[in-house]
């Protein structure tokens, strides 16, 4: 025998369980919509504890289609409207069924009428096209908020103090006064002839070969390039205050790293060349066959990646200062003093990057990774130098070149 659902009590107010504002909308406590965790999942914080669905009395999960309802009634109402099912609903008991969490699935018509009676809004149910548009709008708003948050975080990041600005200006001027050709390097560079560096003749133990003509061309510019690195360091007060022994160790350790950085920031994607010492534009194979071997690839790749950073003179100068003041060089006496100097440059560097407000996400940590790349280039060159010294005629090496790169750690 079929069980007959209970009848609705006449005169009952289906909105008694909800609190409404004058405009008919459900009030949200404190206007908050954050989530809180319960044993049954996530529920909005504006719900009272154990608040019931206004349709069936089950535990409510949120504010759906203008009413506080459970997930079941929300889904039932949405499907009914989206698929236009309500004209097909019927009731065996004159539309007088009581709807609760036990009987709600027994009569679709009475359940739908209860949804309408408590105030669920049909016009808030979106069809597929509107739902896609809404989802797109939500994503756009989310992206907009993300960008606004990024801008706010950039604005809140500390910028250089007056003392740091002094440090920054000194480093910048030291770089500019020792950086050959300055900003005019493109107009003044000369391309190494294509026939130089294309016919390696001296074999190296690592399998590479060296073109002695190209090597000879590079040695002509290496001495002034080294001298400019030394001059840069001496213009930094923190460096000049160190003992001569520490100055020599730091210079020998960072010289190739700084020269590589100065070449890398003068990478030209149009000609795919690096400009050495501000005057000689060379191709990858020429630099490789001229003695640098695989080190050439590393410097070219660094140049390509740095081109996206759009570094200015100050950032290059501070990067050089950080490389110079490295405490892990063997034999240093004033390690603590050098470490404090590097920390001062790093902090000023970070604050200056904040001041510049680059558009690249995570610009600062990405830039610091280039320090690691340059340290690797320096280590690879030290190993390469040992092979070159054995295989190439000693008279081809300038005295300053030998003085700086001999006895380096590999």
Curated annotation (Swiss-Prot):
Location(s) in or outside the cell: Nucleus
Keyword terms of this UniProt record: Cytoplasm, DNA-binding, Metal-binding, Nucleus, Receptor, Transcription, Transcription regulation, Zinc, Zinc-finger
Recorded superkingdom: Eukaryota
GO biological process, one term: retinoic acid receptor signaling pathway
Gene3D superfamilies assigned to the protein according to its UniProt record, in alphabetical order: Erythroid Transcription Factor GATA-1, subunit A (3.30.50.10), Retinoid X Receptor (1.10.565.10)
A single cellular component GO annotation: RNA polymerase II transcription regulator complex
Region Disordered: start-end pairs: 1-32
DNA-binding region: 53-127
CDD domains named in the record: NR_DBD_TR (cd06961), NR_LBD_TR (cd06935)
Ligand binding (3,3',5-triiodo-L-thyronine): 228, 277
Region: Modulating, residue numbers: 1-52
Zinc finger (NR C4-type): 53-73, 91-115
Chief place where the protein resides: nucleus
Residues reported in the UniProt entry to bind Zn(2+) 1: 53, 56, 70, 73
Sequence positions that bind Zn(2+) 2: 91, 97, 107, 110
Residue span, NR LBD domain: 163-407
Single GO MF annotation: RNA polymerase II cis-regulatory region sequence-specific DNA binding
Assembly with partners or alone: Binds DNA as a dimer; homodimer and heterodimer with RXRB. Interacts with NCOA3 and NCOA6 coactivators, leading to a strong increase of transcription of target genes. Probably interacts with SFPQ. Interacts with C1D. Interacts with AKAP13. Interacts with TP53INP2. Interacts with PER2. Interacts with TACC1. The interaction with isoform alpha-1, but not alpha-2, is decreased in the presence of thyroid hormone T3.
Similarity field: Belongs to the nuclear hormone receptor family. NR1 subfamily.
Role according to the record: Nuclear hormone receptor that can act as a repressor or activator of transcription. High affinity receptor for thyroid hormones, including triiodothyronine and thyroxine.
Description of its domains: Composed of three domains: a modulating N-terminal domain, a DNA-binding domain and a C-terminal ligand-binding domain.
PANTHER family, sorted: NUCLEAR HORMONE RECEPTOR, THYROID HORMONE RECEPTOR ALPHA
Protein name from the UniProt record: Thyroid hormone receptor alpha
């Amino acid at each position: 025998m079929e069980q007959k659902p209970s009848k609705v009590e006449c005169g009952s107010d289906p909105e008694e369980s909800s609190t409404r504002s004058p405009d008919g909308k459900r009030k949200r406590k404190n206007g908050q919509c954050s989530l809180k965790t319960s044993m049954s999942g996530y529920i909005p914080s504006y719900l009272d504890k154990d608040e019931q669905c206004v349709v069936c009395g089950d535990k409510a999960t949120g504010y759906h289609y203008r009413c506080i309802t459970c997930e079941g009634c929300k889904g039932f109402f949405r499907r009914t409207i989206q698929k236009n099912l309500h004209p097909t609903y019927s009731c065996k008991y004159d539309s007088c069924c009581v709807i609760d969490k036990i009987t709600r699935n027994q009569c679709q018509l009475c359940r739908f009428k209860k949804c309408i009676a408590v105030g669920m809004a049909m016009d808030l149910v979106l069809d597929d096209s509107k739902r896609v548009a809404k989802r797109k709008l939500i994503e756009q708003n989310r992206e907009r908020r993300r960008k606004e948050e990024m801008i706010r975080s950039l604005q809140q990041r500390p910028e250089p103090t007056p003392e740091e600005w002094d440090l920054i200006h000194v480093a910048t001027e030291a770089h500019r006064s020792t950086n050959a050709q300055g900003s005019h390097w493109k107009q003044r560079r000369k391309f190494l002839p294509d026939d130089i560096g294309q016919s390696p003749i001296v074999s190296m133990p690592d399998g590479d070969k060296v073109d002695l003509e190209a090597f000879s061309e590079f040695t002509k510019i290496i001495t002034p390039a080294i001298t400019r690195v030394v001059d840069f360091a001496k213009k930094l007060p923190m460096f000049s205050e160190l003992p001569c022994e520490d100055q020599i160790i730091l210079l020998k350790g960072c010289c190739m790293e700084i020269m590589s950085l100065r070449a890398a920031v003068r990478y030209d994607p149009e000609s795919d060349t690096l400009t050495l010492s501000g005057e000689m534009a060379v191709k990858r194979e020429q630099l490789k066959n001229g003695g640098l071997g695989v080190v050439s690839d590393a410097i070219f790749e660094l140049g390509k990646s740095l081109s996206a950073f759009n570094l200015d003179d100050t950032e290059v100068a501070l990067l050089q200062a950080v490389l110079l003041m490295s405490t892990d060089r063997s034999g240093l006496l004033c390690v603590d003093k050098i470490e404090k100097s590097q920390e001062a440059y790093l902090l000023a560097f970070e604050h200056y990057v904040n001041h510049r407000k680059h558009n690249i996400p995570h610009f600062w940590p990405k830039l610091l990774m280039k320090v690691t790349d340059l340290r690797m280039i320096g280590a690879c060159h030290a190993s390469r130098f040992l092979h070159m010294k054995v295989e190439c005629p000693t008279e081809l090496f300038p005295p300053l070149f030998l003085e700086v790169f001999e006895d380096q750690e590999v």
